[in-house]
Protein backbone atom coordinates (compact mmCIF):
# COMPACT_ATOMS: atom_id res chain seq x y z
CA UNK A 1 0.00 0.00 0.00
CA UNK A 2 1.30 3.46 -0.89
CA UNK A 3 1.68 5.51 2.27
CA UNK A 4 1.44 9.19 3.20
CA UNK A 5 2.86 10.75 6.36
CA UNK A 6 1.28 13.96 7.64
CA UNK A 7 2.84 15.74 10.61
CA UNK A 8 0.75 18.49 12.19
CA UNK A 9 1.24 20.99 15.00
CA UNK A 10 2.64 24.42 15.71
CA UNK A 11 0.42 27.50 15.89
CA UNK A 12 -3.23 26.54 16.41
CA UNK A 13 -4.48 29.59 14.51
CA UNK A 14 -3.84 27.78 11.25
CA UNK A 15 -6.04 24.88 12.40
CA UNK A 16 -3.46 22.16 11.73
CA UNK A 17 -5.68 19.35 12.99
CA UNK A 18 -8.70 19.89 10.69
CA UNK A 19 -6.43 20.78 7.76
CA UNK A 20 -4.37 17.61 8.21
CA UNK A 21 -7.54 15.55 8.56
CA UNK A 22 -8.85 17.05 5.32
CA UNK A 23 -5.63 16.24 3.49
CA UNK A 24 -5.68 12.74 4.94
CA UNK A 25 -9.22 12.18 3.66
CA UNK A 26 -8.31 13.43 0.19
CA UNK A 27 -5.34 11.10 -0.04
CA UNK A 28 -7.30 8.12 1.28
CA UNK A 29 -9.91 8.77 -1.42
CA UNK A 30 -7.05 8.68 -3.92
CA UNK A 31 -6.03 5.22 -2.70
CA UNK A 32 -3.26 5.98 -0.22
CA UNK A 33 -2.79 4.78 3.34
CA UNK A 34 -2.41 7.83 5.59
CA UNK A 35 -0.65 8.25 8.93
CA UNK A 36 -1.13 11.51 10.87
CA UNK A 37 1.23 12.45 13.71
CA UNK A 38 1.12 15.35 16.17
CA UNK A 39 4.81 15.03 16.98
CA UNK A 40 7.98 15.66 14.98
CA UNK A 41 9.48 12.46 16.33
CA UNK A 42 7.93 10.67 13.34
CA UNK A 43 10.73 12.33 11.35
CA UNK A 44 13.58 10.74 13.31
CA UNK A 45 14.24 7.76 11.01
CA UNK A 46 15.35 8.84 7.54
CA UNK A 47 15.18 5.35 6.06
CA UNK A 48 11.60 4.95 7.22
CA UNK A 49 10.71 8.37 5.79
CA UNK A 50 12.13 7.26 2.45
CA UNK A 51 9.55 4.45 2.35
CA UNK A 52 6.64 6.91 2.12
CA UNK A 53 5.25 8.17 -1.17
CA UNK A 54 4.45 11.57 0.32
CA UNK A 55 5.24 13.70 3.35
CA UNK A 56 2.79 16.52 4.11
CA UNK A 57 3.85 19.34 6.42
CA UNK A 58 1.15 21.04 8.48
CA UNK A 59 3.18 22.81 11.18
CA UNK A 60 3.32 26.61 11.50
CA UNK A 61 5.91 28.84 13.22
CA UNK A 62 7.72 25.99 14.88
CA UNK A 63 11.21 24.90 15.70
CA UNK A 64 12.63 21.61 14.52
CA UNK A 65 15.85 19.70 15.09
CA UNK A 66 17.92 20.29 11.97
CA UNK A 67 18.54 16.55 11.83
CA UNK A 68 14.83 16.04 11.13
CA UNK A 69 14.97 18.49 8.23
CA UNK A 70 17.99 16.63 6.90
CA UNK A 71 16.02 13.38 7.19
CA UNK A 72 13.17 14.83 5.13
CA UNK A 73 15.71 16.17 2.64
CA UNK A 74 17.21 12.69 2.36
CA UNK A 75 13.82 11.06 1.78
CA UNK A 76 12.66 13.63 -0.75
CA UNK A 77 15.99 13.42 -2.54
CA UNK A 78 15.38 9.70 -3.00
CA UNK A 79 11.93 10.30 -4.50
CA UNK A 80 9.44 10.79 -1.66
CA UNK A 81 7.11 13.70 -2.40
CA UNK A 82 6.73 16.77 -0.17
CA UNK A 83 3.61 18.94 -0.06
CA UNK A 84 1.89 21.50 2.11
CA UNK A 85 -0.07 24.72 2.22
CA UNK A 86 -0.06 28.23 3.68
CA UNK A 87 2.07 28.67 6.81
CA UNK A 88 1.99 24.93 7.45
CA UNK A 89 4.81 24.49 4.96
CA UNK A 90 6.29 27.84 3.93
CA UNK A 91 6.23 29.38 7.39
CA UNK A 92 6.87 26.15 9.27
CA UNK A 93 10.46 26.62 10.39
CA UNK A 94 11.66 30.19 9.94
CA UNK A 95 15.12 29.52 11.32
CA UNK A 96 15.96 26.57 9.07
CA UNK A 97 17.24 27.70 5.68
CA UNK A 98 17.52 24.15 4.33
CA UNK A 99 13.79 23.77 4.86
CA UNK A 100 13.19 26.99 2.92
CA UNK A 101 15.59 25.89 0.16
CA UNK A 102 13.77 22.57 -0.17
CA UNK A 103 10.21 23.95 -0.09
CA UNK A 104 10.85 26.87 -2.43
CA UNK A 105 9.64 29.84 -0.42
CA UNK A 106 9.10 31.63 2.88
CA UNK A 107 6.17 33.77 4.00
CA UNK A 108 7.06 37.37 4.89
CA UNK A 109 3.71 39.23 5.11
CA UNK A 110 -0.06 39.10 4.65
CA UNK A 111 -0.93 42.78 4.04
CA UNK A 112 -4.28 43.57 5.63
CA UNK A 113 -4.53 40.35 7.64
CA UNK A 114 -7.42 37.93 7.20
CA UNK A 115 -10.57 38.63 5.18
CA UNK A 116 -8.93 40.04 2.05
CA UNK A 117 -10.82 39.44 -1.19
CA UNK A 118 -8.58 38.58 -4.13
CA UNK A 119 -8.36 36.47 -7.26
CA UNK A 120 -6.21 33.43 -7.85
CA UNK A 121 -5.16 33.28 -11.49
CA UNK A 122 -4.33 29.86 -12.89
CA UNK A 123 -1.25 29.75 -15.08
CA UNK A 124 -1.83 27.05 -17.66
CA UNK A 125 1.16 25.18 -19.01
CA UNK A 126 2.52 21.67 -19.11
CA UNK A 127 1.52 20.71 -15.56
CA UNK A 128 -1.42 18.30 -15.19
CA UNK A 129 -2.18 19.92 -11.83
CA UNK A 130 -3.88 22.94 -13.41
CA UNK A 131 -5.54 21.22 -16.37
CA UNK A 132 -9.15 22.37 -16.65
CA UNK A 133 -9.01 24.67 -13.61
CA UNK A 134 -10.25 28.25 -13.91
CA UNK A 135 -9.39 31.43 -12.00
CA UNK A 136 -11.25 31.69 -8.70
CA UNK A 137 -11.89 34.19 -5.88
CA UNK A 138 -10.62 33.76 -2.33
CA UNK A 139 -11.37 35.61 0.89
CA UNK A 140 -8.51 34.95 3.29
CA UNK A 141 -4.99 36.12 4.03
CA UNK A 142 -3.13 37.39 0.97
CA UNK A 143 0.27 35.74 1.22
CA UNK A 144 3.40 37.63 0.20
CA UNK A 145 6.35 35.26 -0.05
CA UNK A 146 10.03 35.27 -0.90
CA UNK A 147 10.34 32.55 -3.52
CA UNK A 148 12.94 30.38 -5.21
CA UNK A 149 13.39 31.44 -8.87
CA UNK A 150 13.59 27.74 -9.79
CA UNK A 151 9.92 27.05 -9.01
CA UNK A 152 7.36 26.29 -11.72
CA UNK A 153 4.49 28.67 -10.98
CA UNK A 154 1.00 27.15 -11.27
CA UNK A 155 -1.11 30.06 -9.98
CA UNK A 156 -0.59 33.71 -9.05
CA UNK A 157 -2.34 36.63 -7.39
CA UNK A 158 -1.90 40.36 -8.02
CA UNK A 159 -0.31 42.67 -5.45
CA UNK A 160 -0.91 45.21 -4.02
CA UNK A 161 -4.52 44.95 -2.86
CA UNK A 162 -3.95 46.65 0.51
CA UNK A 163 -1.78 49.75 0.69
CA UNK A 164 1.43 49.50 2.69
CA UNK A 165 5.08 50.37 2.03
CA UNK A 166 5.34 47.64 -0.59
CA UNK A 167 2.69 49.39 -2.71
CA UNK A 168 5.21 52.01 -3.86
CA UNK A 169 6.55 49.31 -6.19
CA UNK A 170 4.96 48.28 -9.47
CA UNK A 171 2.08 45.74 -9.40
CA UNK A 172 3.37 42.17 -9.30
CA UNK A 173 1.97 38.68 -9.69
CA UNK A 174 2.88 36.68 -6.59
CA UNK A 175 3.06 32.88 -6.87
CA UNK A 176 0.20 31.14 -5.04
CA UNK A 177 0.97 27.55 -6.03
CA UNK A 178 4.11 25.99 -7.41
CA UNK A 179 6.11 22.85 -7.98
CA UNK A 180 9.82 22.17 -7.90
CA UNK A 181 12.21 19.27 -7.55
CA UNK A 182 14.53 18.35 -4.71
CA UNK A 183 16.84 15.63 -5.94
CA UNK A 184 14.55 12.95 -7.33
CA UNK A 185 11.58 14.14 -5.27
CA UNK A 186 8.67 16.35 -6.24
CA UNK A 187 7.65 19.33 -4.11
CA UNK A 188 4.24 21.06 -4.23
CA UNK A 189 3.10 24.16 -2.34
CA UNK A 190 -0.19 26.07 -2.17
CA UNK A 191 -0.29 29.33 -0.16
CA UNK A 192 -4.07 29.20 0.44
CA UNK A 193 -5.98 28.16 3.57
CA UNK A 194 -5.43 30.43 6.55
CA UNK A 195 -8.35 28.45 7.96
CA UNK A 196 -9.61 25.03 6.94
CA UNK A 197 -12.92 26.38 5.59
CA UNK A 198 -11.13 28.24 2.79
CA UNK A 199 -11.16 24.91 0.96
CA UNK A 200 -14.96 24.72 1.33
CA UNK A 201 -15.57 28.31 0.26
CA UNK A 202 -13.20 28.01 -2.72
CA UNK A 203 -13.49 24.41 -4.02
CA UNK A 204 -10.85 25.02 -6.69
CA UNK A 205 -8.37 25.64 -3.89
CA UNK A 206 -9.02 22.12 -2.59
CA UNK A 207 -8.84 20.61 -6.07
CA UNK A 208 -5.51 22.35 -6.63
CA UNK A 209 -4.22 20.97 -3.33
CA UNK A 210 -5.45 17.45 -4.02
CA UNK A 211 -3.89 17.34 -7.47
CA UNK A 212 -0.63 18.77 -6.16
CA UNK A 213 -0.33 16.18 -3.40
CA UNK A 214 -1.05 13.33 -5.80
CA UNK A 215 1.47 14.70 -8.32
CA UNK A 216 4.15 14.88 -5.62
CA UNK A 217 3.37 11.35 -4.42
CA UNK A 218 3.52 9.92 -7.95
CA UNK A 219 7.14 10.99 -8.22
CA UNK A 220 8.03 8.14 -5.86
CA UNK A 221 6.80 5.56 -8.36
CA UNK A 222 8.75 7.26 -11.14
CA UNK A 223 11.95 7.19 -9.07
CA UNK A 224 11.48 3.49 -8.29
CA UNK A 225 10.55 2.48 -11.83
CA UNK A 226 13.59 4.26 -13.27
CA UNK A 227 16.00 3.15 -10.53
CA UNK A 228 16.95 6.75 -9.79
CA UNK A 229 19.78 7.27 -7.32
CA UNK A 230 21.06 10.33 -5.48
CA UNK A 231 24.72 10.01 -6.49
CA UNK A 232 24.70 13.04 -8.75
CA UNK A 233 23.30 15.22 -5.96
CA UNK A 234 25.52 14.17 -3.07
CA UNK A 235 28.19 16.63 -1.93
CA UNK A 236 30.18 16.87 1.30
CA UNK A 237 30.94 20.57 0.88
CA UNK A 238 29.47 23.03 3.36
CA UNK A 239 25.98 24.09 2.23
CA UNK A 240 24.60 26.02 5.23
Write out the residue ranges for each language-model feature:
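Proline-centered loop/turn at the N-terminus of a beta-strand
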Residues: 81-83, 152, 186
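Short, solvent-exposed loop/turn segments at secondary-structure junctions
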Residues: 11-12, 62, 89-91, 158-161, ...
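Helical hinge/lid and interdomain linker segments adjacent to catalytic or ligand-binding clefts
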Residues: 3-6, 12-92
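Hydrophobic residues at beta-strand termini and immediately following loops
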Residues: 7, 37, 156, 190
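A glycine-rich, often tryptophan-bearing local segment used as a flexible ligand/cofactor-contacting loop or short
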Residues: 63-132
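Catalytic beta-strand/loop cores that center a nucleophilic Ser/Cys/Thr
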Residues: 28, 51, 108, 113-184, ...
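Oxidoreductase and adenylate-handling cofactor-binding alpha/beta cores
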Residues: 99-107, 136-152, 192-193, 206-220
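Extracellular ligand-binding/catalytic regions of CAZymes and related secreted enzymes
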Residues: 2-3, 29-30, 168-174, 182-240
Amino acid sequence: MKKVLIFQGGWDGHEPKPVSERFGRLMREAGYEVEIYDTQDCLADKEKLAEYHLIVACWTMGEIPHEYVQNISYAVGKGTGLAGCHGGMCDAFRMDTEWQFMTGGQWVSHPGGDGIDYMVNIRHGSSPITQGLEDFPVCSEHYYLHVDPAIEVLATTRFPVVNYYHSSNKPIDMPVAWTKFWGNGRVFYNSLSHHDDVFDKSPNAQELMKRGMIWAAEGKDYALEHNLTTERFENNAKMY
